[in-house]
């Protein structure tokens, strides 16, 4: 829940030869000379490829990838969809998304032939969390947001399937009475929160559920959110109100808005949940501002990004109460095994 009211794997690992279809389009290089565009990274006239900075790439495979990318850049949306369909890849999305998807497919195929992948690129599981919290119309600066819905969607990164879900409502204690605006926005009723446990009890249930999935022990995992606010604001405020330290497993996470913007090269204004879905050719499924439904839709975006070749990895953390970015140059790391945090003194 961000503070903005009004997000089949391509390629066959066993494939022995990278597909080398031709693009029918011809591009004039000069009045006398024309060059056919091929998706095998080679030029039909045998001329030497030079990188944009004037020097050769060190490995021929990167020349092939660059040539393929150039051809893809010149394809129409219909040609992109036809080529994606040929390889049984997802054909929905805006043109820039389709280009990125096809480029990553060819890149993965070519690099797979060059050398086998070394090491773990992905987490075994991603836990998608999108809190719903108490709110008032206009969100006054002094208002203390309390978590009233704690959902978790467990995404298996190997099968790209939602393996399980967790959902619990939470009883607020500072502002026990929900505003009409909050009820209308989230669909959560006063009766539902009145009958719910307080946050410490719900957090304990979440941790027990995560432990039952062997997260952080048998399986490498991390948290993923739609924006920074869920972990850096809502959970942080709630832990202070409940006199708990911030849970160690929730101190680092993937902000999918940041990952989406960086991967598809779009501005932050284009990374709201509904816009991300739209650009990927999907509709929102469920009730907006239901924490569980939001989390499921965020998971759908994560799946599509993984299919398109994005390496989702931790990119934000909270340290000393401050939100900080995590450099992509650091080694991939998972969240620690979930433990109930100690009480604050």
Swiss-Prot record:
Keywords noted in UniProt: Cytoplasm, Exonuclease, Hydrolase, Magnesium, Metal-binding, Nuclease, Nucleus, Phosphoprotein, RNA-binding, RNA-mediated gene silencing, rRNA processing
Chain sites annotated for binding Mg(2+) 2: 130, 230
Subcellular localization: Cytoplasm; Nucleus; Nucleus, Nucleolus
Catalytic activity, as annotated: Exonucleolytic cleavage in the 3'- to 5'-direction to yield nucleoside 5'-phosphates
Identification of the protein by name: 3'-5' exoribonuclease 1
The record's free-text note on cofactor binding: Binds 2 magnesium ions per subunit.
Enzyme Commission (EC) number: 3.1.13.1
Organism: Mus musculus
Domain free text: The SAP domain is necessary for binding to the stem-loop structure of histone mRNAs and to form the ternary complex with SLBP, but not for 3'-end histone mRNA exonuclease activity.
Stored PANTHER family: 3'-5' EXONUCLEASE ERI1-RELATED, 3'-5' EXORIBONUCLEASE 1-RELATED
Role of this protein: RNA exonuclease that binds to the 3'-end of histone mRNAs and degrades them, suggesting that it plays an essential role in histone mRNA decay after replication. A 2' and 3'-hydroxyl groups at the last nucleotide of the histone 3'-end is required for efficient 3'-end histone mRNA exonuclease activity and degradation of RNA substrates. Also able to degrade the 3'-overhangs of short interfering RNAs (siRNAs) in vitro, suggesting a possible role as regulator of RNA interference (RNAi). Required for binding the 5'-ACCCA-3' sequence present in stem-loop structure. Able to bind other mRNAs.
Ranges of Basic and acidic residues composition bias in the record: 1-11, 19-46
Stretches assigned to the SAP domain: 72-106
Domain Exonuclease, chain residue ranges per copy: 126-302
Subunit structure: Identified in a histone pre-mRNA complex, at least composed of ERI1, LSM11, SLBP, SNRPB, SYNCRIP and YBX1. Binds to 40S and 60S ribosomal subunits and to 80S assembled ribosomes. Interacts in a cooperative manner with SLBP to the mature 3'-end of histone mRNAs. Found in a ternary complex with SLBP and the stem-loop structure of the 3'-end of histone mRNAs.
UniProt-annotated catalytic positions: 132, 289
Binding site for Mg(2+) 1: 130, 132, 294
Effect of residue 107 to A: Impairs binding to and processing of 5.8S rRNA
Tissues where this protein is expressed: Widely expressed with high levels in spleen, thymus and testis (at protein level).
SMART domains per UniProt: EXOIII (SM00479), SAP (SM00513)
Impact upon substituting residue 132 to G: No effect on binding to 5.8S rRNA
């Amino acid at each position: 829940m961000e503070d903005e009211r009004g997000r089949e794997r391509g390629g066959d690992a066993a494939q022995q030869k990278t597909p080398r279809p031709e693009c029918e389009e011809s591009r004039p290089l000069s009045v006398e000379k024309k060059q056919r565009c091929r998706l095998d990274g080679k030029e039909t006239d045998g001329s030497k490829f030079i990188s944009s900075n004037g020097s050769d790439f060190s490995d021929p495979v990167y020349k092939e990838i660059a040539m393929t990318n150039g051809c893809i850049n010149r394809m129409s949306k219909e040609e992109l969809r036809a080529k994606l369909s040929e390889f049984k890849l997802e054909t929905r999305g805006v043109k820039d998304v389709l280009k990125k998807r096809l480029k990553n497919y060819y890149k993965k195929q070519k690099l797979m032939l060059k050398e086998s992948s070394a090491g773990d690129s992905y987490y075994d599981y991603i836990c998608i969390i999108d809190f719903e919290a108490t709110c008032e119309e206009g969100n006054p600066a002094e208002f203390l947001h309390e978590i009233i819905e704690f959902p978790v969607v467990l995404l298996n990164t190997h099968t790209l399937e939602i393996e399980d879900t967790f959902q619990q409502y939470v009883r607020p204690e500072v502002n026990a009475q929900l505003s009409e605006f909050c009820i209308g926005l989230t669909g959560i009723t006063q009766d539902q929160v009145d009958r719910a446990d307080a946050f410490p009890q719900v957090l304990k249930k979440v941790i027990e559920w995560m432990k039952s999935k062997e997260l952080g022990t048998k399986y490498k995992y991390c948290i993923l959110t739609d924006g920074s606010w869920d972990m850096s604001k809502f959970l942080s405020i709630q832990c202070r109100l409940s006199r708990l330290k911030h849970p160690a497993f929730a101190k680092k996470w993937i902000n999918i808005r940041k990952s989406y913007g960086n991967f598809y090269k779009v501005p932050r204004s284009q990374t709201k949940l509904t816009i991300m879905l739209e650009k990927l050719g999907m509709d929102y499924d469920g009730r907006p501002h239901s924490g569980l439904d939001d989390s499921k839709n965020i998971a759908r975006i994560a799946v599509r990004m993984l299919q398109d070749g994005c390496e989702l990895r931790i990119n934000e953390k909270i340290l000393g109460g401050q939100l900080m970015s995590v450099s992509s140059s650091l080694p991939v790391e998972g969240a620690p095994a979930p433990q109930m945090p100690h009480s604050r003194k």
